Amino acid sequence: MELADIVVAVPLDAFSSTDYNRADEIIKAGYDAAANKAAILSTLAVDTATWQQYLANREARQRSAPIPKFVAVTGTGPRLARNIEHDMADVKGNPVDAAKMQKRILYLQGLGRFNNLSYQMTERNGQPGLLILAEERQYAPPIVRPLLLVDGSDFLNPTFNLGARITFLDVGDFRSEWRNDVIVGSQYGITSEYYHPFHPDSNWFVSPQAYANNSNFPLYNQNTLVANYRQEIVGGGGDIGYIFGRTAELRFGYQVGNESFRRRIANAELPKVSGRFGFTRLQFQLDTQNSNTIATSGNALIFRTDYFDANPGAPHGFPLSEVASFNNFPLNHLTSAYLNAFGGTTYGYNAGIPPFSLGGTVRLAAWGTNALLTNQYFLFQTGVLRQLAQLPPFLGGGLFFNARFEVGKAYGIPYLPTVQGDVVGAFEVNTIFGPVMVGGAVGNAGHQKFFFRIGRLF
C-alpha cells in the first residue's frame, strides 16, 4: 500500500463478514470514498474523443464469434449427454445468443441434478462447436428434501411430524420424475407420483399416483373441541396433462379410493363414516410468485372442477368446483400488499362429508382447524407484508410482519353470523427448517386465538 501513488481508503469498520444484506451500503461507501479523492482522480481522466477512440480500437480488435456446427456435452453419462445435445440442437447453425443461452443453462441446472453447468466454444475436425460443461451432484439423484412440521393452530394441542420428499430423476426417460413423500408423527402417510412426458421435448405428460394417509381430523363446536377423528385415505389415480412453460399446467384425470373417519376422542353417539370415493377432475394451476413460502410479488391461480360418482355419506353423485387466487403487489423493496380470493361450491348437492374446510392458520385463522366444514364458501384476504430484518443466508431469509384482514362465509352452518371475519397479525420468517410463523387472530362471534407453525407440507 505504501508504494501506491493514490490510495482510496474505504471505511469498513462498521461492517462484518456476515453483512450480506448491507451490500448497497458498502457500495455507497466505496463511491463516497472515491468522491473524496475526485480532485486527484480527475487528473487521470481523458476527454470524450480519446475515450471514443479507445472504444473503437477495442471493438476493431474483437473477433466475431464462430457459428457452432455441433453441440457436445462433457461431465455426465452418455444417455443424459445425448438428451442435452438433443435439447440444444437448435443452436447449431445459428450465432450464439448469450442471454438466451444463459436462460437455457439455468433451466437445465434447475432440474436439480447438476452442481454446475457452463458452456464454451470448442473445435472438432476443424469445425467450431458448442461445448456444454456439466458437473453432476455427487449426492443426487435421488434428491432428498427433509420435512419438519409443527402445527400449533391449536397451541394447546400442537401436532408434530417428520418426513422427506425423495425424488428420482430421469426414470424411464429424460425429464421424467418419480416423486415420493413420506411423513410420520401425528400424521402417517406415503404418496408416490410418476411424472412422464410423452417424449423429452413434449409439453404433454402422464402422471399416475398412489397414496395412503392417516391424519388427525378435529371437530369443533364454535371454539370448543368436541371430537377428534382419524381420517384414513387409501387411493390412487392418474392424469394426462399439458405444461405451459415453467409457470402453468393443466391436468385431466380420475381418482379412486376409500376414505374412513374413525373416532378417537368423541361421544359414542357421533357417527363413524367410511366408503368409496371416486371423481373425475380437471385442474389448472398458474404460479408466477417469487416464493412458494413468503411471496412478495407475482400471482398464483388454482382452479379445479370435479365430478364425484361416489363419496362417503353422499346419497348420489355431485359436481364440485373451487378456485384460489393469490395476488401480490410490491410497494417498495421492503413492503408489499396482497389480495387473495377463494371460493368453492357443490352447486347445492349433498356431498356427504363436506369437502371444504376453513379455520387453522391460513384461512380464517381465528377459527380452529375444521371449525367451518361446508359445501359452499367464499373468502377474501387483504393485507400488508413488511420485511423487518434479513437473516444471514446460511440461516434463512427475511423476517416479515404480516397484517391481514379476512372476511368470508361458510354456508349451511346455523350458529354462525352472516359473515365470518378476523384480523390477523403474525411474524413470519424463512429458516433452514422451513417457514416459521407466530401470531394471533381476533374474529367476530368471540373467536380469538394464538397460533404458531414451523415448516410446511411439500
Named regions from a protein language model:
Residues L12-F15, R22, A441-H447:
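A short, acidic, flexible beta-alpha connecting loop/helix-capping segment that sits on the rim
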Residues G110, N116-S118, G129, I143-S153, ...:
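C-terminal outer-membrane beta-barrel translocator/porin domains of Gram-negative envelope proteins
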Residues L3-D5, P68, N375-L379, G396-N402, ...:
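Active-site lining segments that contact anionic ligands and/or coordinate catalytic metals
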Residues M1, Q390, I413, D422-F427:
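Short glycine-rich, acidic/polar surface loops and turns
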Residues V7-V10, F400-R404, P435-A441:
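Conserved active-site loop/cleft motifs that coordinate metal ions or position small ligands
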Residues M1-F15, E25-Y31:
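Conserved catalytic block of serine-dependent lipid acyl chemistry
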Residues N116-Q283, Q289-S291, F356-V362, A371-T374, ...:
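Gram-negative/organellar outer-membrane beta-barrel architecture
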Residues D24-D151, A164-R165, D181-F198, V234, ...:
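Periplasmic polypeptide-binding modules associated with outer-membrane biogenesis and secretion
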